[in-house]
């Protein structure tokens, strides 16, 4: 396994359209293992393929119950939200949007159709924090960052902060 480079805002790969996964092979297994290792090393609780420069509809999410438990994760290929209910506001951060935590409104309960690592169709209904994590990661597959859910004022303040990071000293 390998730790991959995480692409950060404003890298254009984060805004690219992703393509569906059609081949489920050892190469995909290796990619998901590397993504999981990268996610846990960061540390994070979810990672989408665009965040490591791959324009694929692929997500890994932590299923560990506590931070100190072993590294358990699930793979979701071609995930799609097919049902959504209610809303909630929760704090989010993103490995691709460093140094920003913000309150974001999301659905409280969602149903997601996806394929597992073997290409088998699956469906799951999730609530609360896990629903937030999945919506956040699926947004990445559509070129959407959690930054896009913020007010224009907060978004512009963050963009100015990022520009300062790249100014010559």
UniProtKB/Swiss-Prot annotation:
State a single Gene Ontology molecular function. Answer: peptide deformylase activity
Q: Which Gene3D superfamilies did the record assign?
A: Peptide deformylase
Query: What Enzyme Commission number(s) does the record list for this chain?
Result: 3.5.1.88
Binding-site positions, Fe cation: 94, 136, 140
Q: Which reaction does it catalyse?
A: N-terminal N-formyl-L-methionyl-[peptide] + H2O = N-terminal L-methionyl-[peptide] + formate
Q: Per UniProt, which keywords does this protein have?
A: Hydrolase, Iron, Metal-binding, Protein biosynthesis
Q: Which Gene Ontology BP annotations are present?
A: co-translational protein modification; translation
Entry cofactor note text?
Binds 1 Fe(2+) ion.
Cofactor list:
Fe(2+)
Alphabetized InterPro entries for the sequence: Peptide_deformylase (IPR023635), Peptide_deformylase_sf (IPR036821)
* Family according to the record: Belongs to the polypeptide deformylase family.
Per the entry, what this protein does is:
Removes the formyl group from the N-terminal Met of newly synthesized proteins. Requires at least a dipeptide for an efficient rate of reaction. N-terminal L-methionine is a prerequisite for activity but the enzyme has broad specificity at other positions.
Give the protein name, as stated in the record. Answer: Peptide deformylase
From what organism does this protein derive?
A: Desulfotalea psychrophila (strain LSv54 / DSM 12343)
